[in-house]
């Protein structure tokens, strides 16, 4: 629930974040770890850190902006722009969302938390982060690059011959099928946290972590749907078109 400006006055950080977990991210952007200043009032934090309350609220409001474009808009976008949109999401995941969650988990004090999965989460998440980053980099350097080659070849017939060997090396159909059928990267964490359930969770720090993980899981699902329902189907059609053109060129020669 978004906490309005008038409701921030004389409120402790713990109360503000408890009512609206996204204020934890907003505070983080101003160099404030909410769990280190939980008993401070917002006015005191603004003075200590040297920022205005209105700036904090403005940043918090910006976090409500829609993560995704309308699918219909992406369906009609040129394919190279769909790729750029997905790369933008990758950049957001790697440089913004995941480092923030990783920092929250690393700084979780488990000494006073009687949940076994807290230590498990501290152990598992760094490995997840590393594997996810490697997956994204591989996707960009191989799959996205290949799809961009298809796009530019379609707009410049001189590039067609350059695609011949790439099309022999990459099975876009198999990649698309594997991507559609693979388990979500978050399935293990989802199971560990019982679908991010806040039942019986008293630690505010842990509640924020769970809600951030849940939000990331949702964002990742949207991202995967764009790849599965828009990017790959359109790229496969384009690949078929270019394959036919290459066959025609070969026949004429």
Task: List where the protein language model places each region.
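Small-residue-biased structural context
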Residues: 1-253
């Amino acid at each position: 629930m978004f906490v309005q400006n008038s409701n921030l006055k004389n409120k402790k950080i713990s109360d503000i974040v408890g009512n609206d977990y996204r204020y934890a991210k907003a505070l983080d952007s101003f160099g404030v770890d909410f769990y280190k200043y939980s008993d401070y009032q917002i006015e005191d934090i603004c003075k200590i850190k040297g920022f205005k309350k209105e700036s904090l609220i403005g940043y918090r409001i910006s976090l409500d902006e829609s993560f995704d474009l309308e699918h219909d808009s992406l369906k009609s976008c040129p394919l190279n722009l769909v790729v750029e949109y997905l790369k933008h999401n990758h950049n957001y995941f790697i440089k913004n969302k995941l480092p923030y969650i990783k920092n929250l988990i690393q700084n979780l004090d488990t000494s006073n938390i009687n949940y076994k999965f807290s230590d498990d989460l501290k152990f598992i998440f760094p490995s997840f982060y590393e594997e996810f980053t490697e997956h994204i980099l591989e996707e960009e350097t191989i799959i996205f690059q290949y799809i961009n080659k298809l796009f530019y070849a379609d707009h410049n017939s001189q590039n067609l011959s350059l695609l011949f060997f790439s099309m022999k090396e990459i099975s876009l159909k198999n990649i698309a099928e594997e991507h559609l059928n693979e388990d979500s990267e978050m399935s293990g964490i989802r199971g560990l946290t019982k679908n991010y359930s806040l039942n019986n969770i008293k630690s505010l720090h842990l509640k924020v972590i769970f809600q951030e993980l849940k939000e990331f899981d949702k964002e990742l699902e949207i991202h995967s749907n764009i790849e599965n329902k828009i990017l790959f189907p359109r790229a496969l059609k384009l690949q078929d078109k270019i394959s036919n053109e290459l066959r025609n060129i070969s026949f004429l020669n």
